[in-house]
Design a protein with these regions (language model features):
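Sec/Tat signal peptide C-region and signal peptidase I cleavage site
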Residues: 16-20
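Generic structural microfeature
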Residues: 15, 47-48, 100
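Bacterial N-terminal signal peptides that target proteins for export
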Residues: 1-6
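Aromatic- and glycine-enriched beta-alpha-beta binding-site module
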Residues: 83-159
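Bacterial N-terminal signal peptides
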Residues: 7-15
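Interaction-surface and assembly-scaffold signal
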Residues: 23-24, 136-260
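N-terminal domain-onset segments
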Residues: 21-84, 214-231, 235-244, 249-260
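Generic structural hydrophobic/aromatic packing signal, biased to beta-strands
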Residues: 44, 78-79, 103-105, 118-119, ...
Length: 260
């Protein structure tokens, strides 16, 4: 493969335009096409206790903090995803709209890099999900836009109430701005079973709201809290927010290994 798979969109420098990127490898090198999805996302990354996250990885995998870009140094990603549509390999709609929150760790197994999905919260009907780590929860999203001639402020409020007592809240506001288009391939594996994996061919718009490494602080009133279960171990008060990004559009093609 001419280009190594990137573990995350957050490896991409925040101002990288699509025209400046190297061509992606042919899609048939990624595996068997299994569908596509369209979403809107908000992503936070954190630096948390290395020992805690290492113990959550599959055998043979080691922690590999994000090496560059707005999330440099982060070892945990929290994705707030609003799924708008999903189609199967035949192009027919599957599933419906859904809000979910996904936790993942950047990791390495020898030369292979990926994000290990350690936990996800979504509607009970979809748990435990493809990666086998989903937990039933009520996920509530409120988003508002105040704009004049499409210039204005967006406010988001997320809450997660897991059936096992897990709780997550996120609130933030930011000025609407022109996203940078980023196209990238990314691999995810299940922390419960690394043989369960997908590769995504992603086309997205990226707006950096906050980045400690790059000195960016455009998020307004950002508050995040997570408690209960695994969340309590990850967010024990010592965590540091590394970055926050908005992905106003996020479309991906899904590929799985031929043997899966």
């Amino acid at each position: 493969m001419r280009r190594a798979l990137l573990a995350s969109i957050l490896l991409v420098p925040c101002a990288l335009p699509a025209l400046g990127q190297a061509p992606l490898p042919p899609a048939d090198t990624l595996g068997v096409y299994s569908g596509a999805a369209a979403e809107t996302r908000t992503v936070l990354t954190f630096k948390v206790n290395d020992d805690v996250v290492q113990k959550l990885l599959p055998d043979g995998w080691t922690l590999a903090p994000i090496a560059q870009g707005p999330a440099k140094g982060a070892n945990l990603s929290v994705v707030f995803a609003e799924r708008l549509a999903t189609v199967g390999p035949d192009g027919k709609a599957v599933g419906g709209e859904e809000a979910s929150v996904i936790l993942s760790i950047p990791a390495r197994n020898n030369a292979e890099t990926a994000f290990a999905i350690i936990e996800a919260y979504s509607d009970a009907a979809t748990a435990p999900g493809f990666y086998k780590v989903g937990k039933p929860a009520k996920v509530t999203l409120e988003r508002s836009l105040r704009a004049t001639n499409l210039t204005g402020t967006i406010e988001e409020s997320w809450s997660v109430a897991g059936d096992g007592g897990e709780r997550i809240t996120l609130r933030l506001g930011y000025e609407r701005s022109q996203p940078s288009r980023v196209q990238v391939d990314s691999r995810n594996v299940s922390a419960a079973d690394a043989r369960v994996r997908r590769t995504y061919r992603i086309d997205q718009g990226l707006v950096v709201l906050a980045s400690a490494p790059n000195g960016v602080d455009q998020a307004k009133g950002l508050t995040f809290n997570a408690t209960g279960g695994l969340l309590g171990r990850l967010f024990d008060g010592s965590q540091q927010l590394v970055s926050a990004v908005s992905l106003p559009w996020y479309s991906r093609q899904l590929y799985v290994p031929a043997s899966q």
